[in-house]
Amino acid sequence: MHERGPSMSAPTTYRGSITREQWLVDETRTVARLRLEDRAFLDTRALAAHILENNLFQYPTEREVGSIARACARRLDALSSDPDRRDRLTGLIAHGTTEQLRQANLYALMRDNRLVWDFMTCVVESKFSLLDMHLGKTEIATFLEGLRAQDERVATWSPATLNKIRQVLAQCLEQCGMYERKTEQLSTLLLDYDLENLIRENGDAGILPAFGLAL
């Protein structure tokens, strides 16, 4: 898998829970706003209780509200180890434009889940570097099979789980405006200036080619 440089912040855990958690852009914006407005909501129990009581996710049942609220909070926590920088990144998700929200949400996913980090820096970055804009289902599946051979946690995942993860990875790219699933074509982003600067400040400039940018 992609080797991280000394200043890059690749997470260590491959999270199969992405099959359930998925993109969550609206939920993450809701959580980001709450946490910036009231520091009491840095406590995930208080956060989940408030979301549930006020039906802020507008889910038809209460069953998944707590776990999804915790997942959103975990992703926001993963944005940076520096509190000020984390707040600024959270601000892009909470109050930014639609493009800032989507792009920062993808960055949060990368920082939270080694699966997404490796997919972006191994597969997507390689495609951009080769000017090969076709990303087929089989290529994503091959990437996941490679992980399965290298990581004990991933090795326990069933073929059905891996297939669902393949779909979620493609969906995340599409939701961010980087992929068209029908044609299986990638496209580079016009990465938001503020987000790019925060990524650089965060020591993660090495991931910029995964968004189609030069270092």
Range-by-range predicted roles:
Residues T28, V116-W117, K137, R166:
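Short, leucine-enriched amphipathic alpha-helices that occur as contiguous helical runs
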Residues A155-L215:
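Accessory, usually C-terminal, subdomains that scaffold auxiliary metal cofactors
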Residues H2-Q103:
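Eukaryotic partner-binding/assembly regions in large regulatory complexes
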Residues Q22, P60-R63, S67, R111, ...:
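Alpha-helix boundary/N-cap detector
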Residues A104-Y107, R111-M133:
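Positively charged, polyanion-binding regions of nucleic-acid-associated proteins
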Residues D118-C122, T142, Q171:
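Contiguous, well-ordered alpha-helical segments that form the cores/surfaces of helical PPI scaffolds
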Residues K127, A149-T156:
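Inter-helical turn/loop segments and adjacent helix faces that build the functional surface
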Residues G136-E152:
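DNA-recognition alpha helix
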